[in-house]
């Protein structure tokens, strides 16, 4: 069976819902929490670097970014492997994204507190996107605030119909089936429909721009 991933990132983890389509009906194949860090500080690497000297702060941030990317790729490969062992083919991965972040340097992010929150959110979304590409999956990056609109268009179904579909899926698997799972499932539905490509980027790379690279 062909399946698609739907993913919603948080600081240090992501919600994953795997959906398939059998005889025209969507079904939940799997859903789980994907851990994207090994250490507590890595959930907020910019915050961890906030009070350090510039060189040490940069090293901490870059280490956090590299670790998130590495873990995300490993977790994505494991998820694909699980589906192959079930006899399924993963056709795409939908990742919910936010508005692109300005191309701030690490120093510019650390200088303003709210930027740290934005950068950390972008980090884990970007990690999922990089992992999707590393595993050779078709990426469907969907702006979270446009998810319903894209779903209505891709599925040719009004909002009321989408709500019913998501509710039916939730009843079939039971809790947990909160906002994260619902949004990830809806994103996976969009991905299953075919090569929809949302051109909007997730976020600028969070390891800093060229001014910071040595």
Model-derived regions: residue spans:
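Phosphate- and other anionic-substrate recognition elements at nucleic-acid/protein interfaces
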Residues: 1-201, 214
